[in-house]
Amino acid sequence: KVAQIAHDVEIECKTGLGDVLASYYGGFEIRDKPGAPGIGHVQKITLNKISIIMICFSPISTSKFIKERLPRINGLGGKMVNKLLESKNYEHFQEMSLEFAKYVDVMTPRMQKVVNELSKNNIKCGIALFGETIFSMIPKENENKILEILEKYSDGIIIKSELDNTGARVLYN
């Protein structure tokens, strides 16, 4: 019930399009039916020993972004979900993420520079739509290689995380 309320607030305030559903289920998921938890549906893909490393340079207004680009987002997004449902591959997801970011025109020159450098080093990456943010889902043993590259960009904030397959929950009482 709480997650359904959070979803409604997210939509009303235009702060996201399905982030609550993803957070609720956790892990790497493909949203095959939009909506709040209990209404929407995801297909979970269990990934083990994967790190997510990202660099964020600046935020963007999510509500402004959604308002300006929603028709383009929905057009290509649905087609990409179908492709991803076939492959169920996180590397393919990152490739499509880059394609999608270019299509909705969110790539800044600074982001493109990072993407190019990662690509030259055979590191796949994608674009998060909550700011000037590049992410990479990589096997844990390859973390140092990407961190070395990203640390050159002192104007960005680097975040390293693990993929949590459990989803939102109360950690402490």
Outline where the language-model segments fall.
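Gly/Ser-rich oxyanion-binding loop with an adjacent helix/lid
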Residues: 1-37
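C-terminal nucleotide
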Residues: 40-173
